[in-house]
């Protein structure tokens, strides 16, 4: 319930402006988030032709950066981005963020990521790049199984819990992927927490 004001805040990230509502996930360290997202986009190796999925997309931050391209490197972007998150208010923000930033090659759906991926796999859809940033508990078998069925050429997995990330990466490696790069980012200085990015390629 909003007692006063618009019910959201505005922040700028990677040259884009984002609206964040109270129930929407958003990284709290903006400086390091730019480092995190820049590295993730670099790992995706976009050329302007790819269809990318932004799973667990929140307010659409990394998906919209992927759709637009990083400042100074706008040619390295996805042709199309599909975002999914189970928080309806976050998806509302993501759609507004796309509109506000003039991004027309990104669509967002409010649905459980695992169910959505499963549906895409059963419909015979295909992906070139999967960007995933699940909660601390990691992903689940339904999502990972569907991801392997969709067989994107590259998966960029961002995680705030290296333990559950390692578990999920092991599943992906056992099902046709090769771990090519690991890059930690210190999002929370002077704590034992770290954000970690893994890049995987289809063998």
What are these regions (language model features)?
Residues 1-203:
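Rossmann-like S-adenosyl-L-methionine
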């Amino acid at each position: 319930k909003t007692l006063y004001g618009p019910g959201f805040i505005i922040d700028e990230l990677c040259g884009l402006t984002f609206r964040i509502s109270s129930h929407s996930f958003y990284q709290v360290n903006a400086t390091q988030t730019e480092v995190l997202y820049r590295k993730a986009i670099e790992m995706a190796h976009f050329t302007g032709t790819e269809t990318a999925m932004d799973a667990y997309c929140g307010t659409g931050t990394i998906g919209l950066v992927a759709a637009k391209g990083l400042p100074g490197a706008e040619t390295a972007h996805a042709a199309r981005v599909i975002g999914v998150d189970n928080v309806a208010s976050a998806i509302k923000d993501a759609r507004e963020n796309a509109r506000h930033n003039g991004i027309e090659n990104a669509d967002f759906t409010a649905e459980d990521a695992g169910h959505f991926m499963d549906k895409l796999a059963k419909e015979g859809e295909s992906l070139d790049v999967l960007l995933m940033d699940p909660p601390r508990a990691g992903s689940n078998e339904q999502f990972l199984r569907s991801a392997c069925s969709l067989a994107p050429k590259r998966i960029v997995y961002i995680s705030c819990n290296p333990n559950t990330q390692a578990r999920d990466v092991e599943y992906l490696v056992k099902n046709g992927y090769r771990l090519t790069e690991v890059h930690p980012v210190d999002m929370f200085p002077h704590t034992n927490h770290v954000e970690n990015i893994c890049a995987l390629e289809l063998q």
